[in-house]
Curated annotation (Swiss-Prot):
Protein name: Tyrosine--tRNA ligase
Classification via SUPFAM superfamilies: Alpha-L RNA-binding motif, Nucleotidylyl transferase
Keyword Zinc attached: no
Keywords for the protein's UniProt record, in alphabetical order: Aminoacyl-tRNA synthetase, ATP-binding, Cytoplasm, Ligase, Nucleotide-binding, Protein biosynthesis, RNA-binding
Catalysed reaction, written as an equation: tRNA(Tyr) + L-tyrosine + ATP = L-tyrosyl-tRNA(Tyr) + AMP + diphosphate + H(+)
Chain ranges passing through the membrane: none
Gene behind the chain: tyrS
Record-linked InterPro entries: aa-tRNA-synth_I_CS (IPR001412), aa-tRNA-synth_Ic (IPR002305), Rossmann-like_a/b/a_fold (IPR014729), S4_RNA-bd_sf (IPR036986), SYY-like_C (IPR054608), Tyr-tRNA-ligase (IPR002307), Tyr-tRNA-ligase_bac-type (IPR024088), Tyr-tRNA-ligase_bac_1 (IPR024107)
Molecular-function GO term, any one: RNA binding
Catalytic class of the enzyme: ligase
Family: Belongs to the class-I aminoacyl-tRNA synthetase family. TyrS type 1 subfamily.
Description of how the protein assembles with itself and partners: Homodimer.
């Protein structure tokens, strides 16, 4: 039987191991319980989390048991990893709302039936910790000198690192220990930016529990230039259909750079690797067919088959000059909005994230209505724009929205 590690390596998921040979043997010989932590600082996951969930799904399909750890407790502190400033503090109520929303999203990707996977919240054990006991039982195993040399703290020392954030590594390490004791968890998976925190957890479990503990990091989703993927004009590429429509989500993947198609197919779909390599090797006009497959497969996983088909049909209709516009993302305005500037309206209904961004689009010639380029910031919406019952807004080269009047 093939080791899931070979599949993960072949697809390009794994960046680093704490104990590579031990990890390989463990995955060959046992059904391993492992965990990935998710920071509930927003009420939706984004595409950066999606790669972690695909990592989990491949492991689960190979017979291993995932634990999705929602950081309801650690979110009260804030993770300094990769940040140059202290994060905004969230209230307990905000964090709980985010935890509840994320749970619902995760259930679309991971099978939680019959104890095949677990969702737990570290608030359940962190919020009631006795601080003195925690220092005696956990703090004693951490060297401050070594912590300060960790990459996640180095970046913050010049600007100032609060003692609150300094505790984060201990708390994340303690999470691994609790999951090890309670559920037999032996492995942590996570983003490569979490490497220092993950090492701390592995070492804590090995010292306190005297048992197996290991970690491996997942590559971050970057393009061929090394820049993080998943950013749009409106911000992050959220998995929530209310934040980013299935059509816009589909279009994002339909428009990735040719050089990124194979990597995205490998990391974000379940297509066999032979097919991934075949599609990734296509050139010229043929690579567009591979991009359509990528967009459809990723949208299907995130939003379901029906929404993926609708997005595909809408894109085909738009780019072939077809008439079916029913699946293009639609916003509703009132008759009172007629006479307002196009800029004011598209900002009001969130077609663009702000008037500043809308102004930039117009000034750069990137906004049109019904095929007519908007060249003046003072251009107003009028009845003529809605002769066909709706107005079609185009942002950039391939982003569309319909405006209808109610």
């Amino acid at each position: 039987m093939a080791n899931v590690l070979d599949e993960l390596l072949d697809r390009g998921y794994i960046k680093q191991f704490t104990h590579e040979e031990e990890t390989r043997k463990l995955l060959e010989n046992e059904k391993v319980t492992f965990y990935i932590g998710f920071d509930p600082t927003a009420d939706s996951l984004h595409v950066g989390h999606f790669i972690a969930m695909m990592f989990m799904a491949h492991m689960q399909r190979a017979g291993h048991r995932p634990i999705a750890l929602l950081g309801g407790g650690t979110a009260m502190v804030g993770d300094p990893s990769g940040k140059t400033d202290m994060r905004k503090m969230l209230t307990k109520e905000q964090i709980q709302h985010n935890v509840d929303s994320i749970k619902k999203q995760m259930e679309r990707f991971i099978d939680f039936s019959d104890d095949k996977a677990l969702i737990v919240n570290n608030a359940d054990w962190l919020l009631d910790l006795n601080y003195v006991d925690f220092l005696r039982e956990v703090g004693v195993h951490f060297s401050v000198n070594r912590m300060l040399s960790a990459e996640c703290f180095k970046q913050r020392l010049e600007k100032g690192l609060s003692f609150l954030e300094f505790n984060y590594m201990l708390m994340q390490g303690y999470d691994f220990y609790v999951l090890n004791q309670k559920y037999g968890c032996k492995m942590e998976l996570g983003g490569d930016d979490q490497w220092s925190n993950m090492i701390a957890g592995v070492e804590l479990v090995r010292r306190k529990a005297q048992g197996d503990a290991m970690a491996m990091t997942c590559t971050l989703l970057t393009n061929s230039q090394g820049q993080k993927m998943g950013k749009t004009v409106g911000g992050a590429l959220w998995l929530d259909a209310d934040k980013v429509s299935p059509f816009d989500f589909y279009q994002y993947w339909r428009n990735v750079d040719d050089a990124d198609v194979e990597k995205c197919l490998a990391l974000l779909t379940f297509l066999p690797m032979d097919e991934v390599r075949r599609l990734g090797a296509l050139e010229g006009a043929e690579i567009n067919g591979a991009k359509k497959i990528l967009a459809y497969e990723v949208t299907k996983l995130v939003h379901g088959d029906e929404e993926a088909k609708k997005a595909e049909e809408a894109a085909n209709a738009l780019f072939s000059g077809g008439a079916d516009m029913s699946n293009v993302p639609t916003v509703i305005i009132s008759k009172e909005d007629l006479g307002s500037t196009v800029l004011d309206v598209i900002a009001k209904v969130k077609i663009v994230p702000s008037k500043k961004e809308g102004r930039r689009l117009i000034e750069q010639g990137g906004l049109s209505i019904n095929g007519e380029k908007i060249t003046e910031l003072t251009r107003t919406l009028n009845d003529d724009d809605f002769k066909d019952g709706s107005a079609l807004i185009k942002r950039g080269k391939k982003n569309y929205n319909k405006i209808e009047i109610q």
